[in-house]
Design a protein with these regions (language model features):
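Phosphoinositide-binding peripheral membrane targeting modules
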Residues: 34
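Extended glycan-interaction surfaces of carbohydrate-active proteins
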Residues: 1-16, 37-101
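Conserved small-residue packing positions in alpha-helical repeats and bundles
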Residues: 20-23, 88
């Protein structure tokens, strides 16, 4: 999930924590399949070291803006504890929603 259309922060990539947040909402409203799909994507973003980044710049909205941000501020934040926390919130939301249904 992206922050907003036209985002250029590190190219406007997909945000791990926002995707997990959306999955948590989906679980809360009963869309368990959608929530599981978001969880699968989030978990596919773990590095070999077990880190989750702030965002993923594989398919940026503004590819020409990735390099300027990296040159100015360095690589995308990783690990980002907020992403890790939202992953756990989504896992819990899915577990709780599955137990109710």
């Amino acid at each position: 999930m992206r922050r907003y259309l036209g985002d250029t922060f590190y190219g406007g990539g997909e945000w791990v924590l926002l995707t997990a947040w959306l999955g948590t909402h989906m679980a809360a409203v009963g869309d368990l399949e959608g929530a599981r799909q978001r969880l699968d994507w989030v978990e596919s973003m773990f590095t070999a070291d077990g880190d989750l980044p702030e965002q993923v710049t594989v398919h940026p909205q503004a590819p020409d803006m990735v390099a300027p941000w990296v040159m100015r501020w360095g690589p995308v934040a990783r690990p980002l504890l907020w992403s890790h926390g939202m992953h756990l919130v989504l896992v819990r939301a899915l577990r709780d929603a599955s137990a109710v249904r």
